[in-house]
Design a protein with these regions (language model features):
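Conserved N-terminal alpha-helical segment that immediately precedes and caps sugar-phosphate-binding
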Residues: 1-395
C-alpha cells in the first residue's frame, strides 16, 4: 500500500518496543516513515489469554470512530444538512460516549441480566446441550464471537451439513428469513471471496506440504455452513437444545421486526425451548434485555460495541463457570497454529512458574503423551490446561 502511495495506518495493541525487538515484519512496518503507527496498548487485562476482548474492542472503537469522522468530512460538501441528519451524522465525543456506554452496560440491572443469561447458557452446556442464535443485522457480530470460542476455549468448531463425523458446535448462528447463500452475501455486504486454488497453484507458491490434499475453501464449501433458514438437524441432535433470537433495540423499531420474529418462531418449533434477547432500549418484550439508550450514528458504532461486549462477556463468563479459565487466564486454548502454541507456552510459564523453555518442553511432553489418546479425547482435552494441572505445585 505504501509503495502505491496510499496513506498507511498500522494499529495494534502491543508495546511498540516489544514488537520492534522480537518481530521482523513488525519492526519494518513500524520504522517505515510512510506508516502512521497507532499503538493502542491497554496494559494488563482483567482476563487474559485472547485478543478477543480488550484489544479488538479498542481497535473497533478507534477504527470505527475514524471511519465515521471520515464519512462525515467526505459527505458534508455533497449532502444537505437534512440528508446528513437523516444518516445520523452528528458531533460525537467518542471517548465520553464509550465511557457512558460502559457505565450503562455495567449498571446493576444489566449486570444481573448478564449473570442470569450466563447461568442459563452454562446450564445448557453442562447437560451437553446446544444453543442456536437467530439474528439479522447482528449476524456478523454473533458469528464472530461464536467462531472465536472454538480456538479460545477449545470447543467444537462450526461444522458443515455433510459432516457426519464431527460433533456439532456448542453454539451456532442462523438467519430465519434468508437461505444460506443469500445470508452469506447479506452478512458480508458483498459476494464471498473464496479461493479456488488447485494443487498446481499450491506447488507454484512453494506449499508442497499441502499440495497433495489442498484445503477446500471455495464457495460451495462455504455454503455448507448452514447459517440461513434451512433446517439443520445437527442443531437439535442433542438435548437440551435452545433457539435464541438476538436483536438490537434499534432493530425492534424497524418495519421488518414482526416478520423476523414470526420467521424465528417458525424456525424455533424444531427446538425444545426458545428465548429472546434484546440489546438496547426497546418497547418490545424479551426474556433477556440489556437496557441502554445507545446514540445512533452512521455506522451505529456504540451499538456494535455494546453488542460485542455483551457477547464477549456472555461467552467468557460461561466458560469461567465451565472451568475453562485458570485464575484470570483463558487456559483451555487450542494450539492449532504457532501463535496459539506460543500463547499456550506463555500461559504454562506464567501459571506454573516455569521458564519459557521449560514450559515449552512441558507442553511438548504432553503432546507426545496425547499421541496415545483417541481422536475424540484429543479434541475434548486441552493440552495446555492438562500441562498446567500436571505442573501446578511442582515448582
Amino acid at each position: 500500500a505504501a509503495d502505491r502511495n496510499a496513506k498507511v495506518f498500522l494499529m495494534f495493541n502491543n508495546p511498540t518496543e516489544v514488537l520492534r525487538e522480537h518481530i521482523d515484519r513488525s519492526r519494518k512496518a513500524i520504522d517505515d516513515p510512510r506508516v502512521t503507527v497507532l499503538d493502542l496498548y491497554c496494559g494488563p487485562m482483567a482476563i487474559a489469554g485472547s485478543t478477543r476482548m480488550q484489544a479488538t474492542t479498542s481497535e473497533l472503537l478507534v477504527a470505527g470512530a475514524a471511519l465515521e469522522i471520515i464519512l462525515n468530512r467526505v459527505l458534508q460538501p455533497i449532502l444537505s444538512k437534512e440528508q446528513l441528519t437523516s444518516l445520523d451524522f452528528r458531533e460525537i465525543n467518542y471517548t465520553k460516549a464509550f465511557e457512558k456506554m460502559l457505565n450503562g452496560l455495567t449498571g446493576e440491572a444489566n449486570t444481573k441480566t448478564l449473570a442470569d443469561y450466563i447461568k442459563f447458557e452454562r446450564d445448557i452446556y453442562r447437560e451437553n446441550g446446544l444453543i442456536t442464535y437467530f439474528a439479522d443485522e447482528l449476524l456478523m457480530d454473533i458469528l464472530t464471537d461464536t467462531t472465536e470460542r472454538s480456538p479460545t476455549f477449545m470447543l467444537s468448531p462450526y461444522k458443515q451439513y455433510d459432516d457426519t463425523v464431527s460433533p456439532p458446535s456448542w453454539s451456532f448462528v442462523k438467519h430465519p428469513l434468508r437461505p444460506t447463500p443469500e445470508t452469506w452475501e447479506y452478512m458480508l455486504g458483498r459476494a464471498p471471496r473464496c479461493l479456488n486454488w488447485d494443487s498446481d497453484l499450491y506447488r507454484k507458491l512453494g506449499a508442497d506440504a499441502i499440495a497433495s490434499a489442498p484445503p477446500r475453501v471455495n464457495k460451495n464449501e462455504l455454503h455448507k455452513f448452514l447459517i440461513g433458514n434451512e433446517e439443520d438437524p445437527s442443531r437439535t441432535s442433542r438435548e437440551p437444545n435452545v433457539a435464541v433470537a438476538i436483536k438490537s433495540g434499534r432493530e425492534t423499531g424497524k418495519s421488518n421486526f414482526n416478520a423476523f420474529m414470526e420467521a424465528f418462531r417458525q424456525n424455533a418449533k424444531a427446538f425444545q425451548k426458545q428465548h429472546t434477547f434484546i440489546i438496547g432500549n426497546s418497547n418490545k418484550s424479551a426474556d433477556y434485555r440489556i437496557d441502554y439508550d445507545l446514540p445512533s450514528s452512521p455506522l451505529n458504532l456504540m451499538e456494535r460495541l455494546m453488542v460485542k461486549l455483551t457477547l464477549n462477556t456472555i461467552s467468557t463468563g460461561t466458560m469461567v463457570l465451565m472451568g475453562r479459565v485458570t485464575s484470570n487466564w483463558m487456559s483451555w486454548v487450542n494450539i492449532s497454529n504457532k501463535k496459539l502454541r506460543d500463547r499456550g507456552i506463555r500461559l504454562i510459564s506464567e501459571i506454573c512458574g516455569l521458564s519459557y523453555k521449560d514450559a515449552c518442553y512441558a507442553l511438548h511432553e504432553t503432546l507426545e503423551e496425547f499421541e496415545k489418546l483417541s481422536e475424540a479425547d484429543k479434541k475434548s482435552i486441552s493440552p495446555v490446561n492438562y500441562t498446567i494441572q500436571k505442573n501446578q505445585g511442582n515448582h
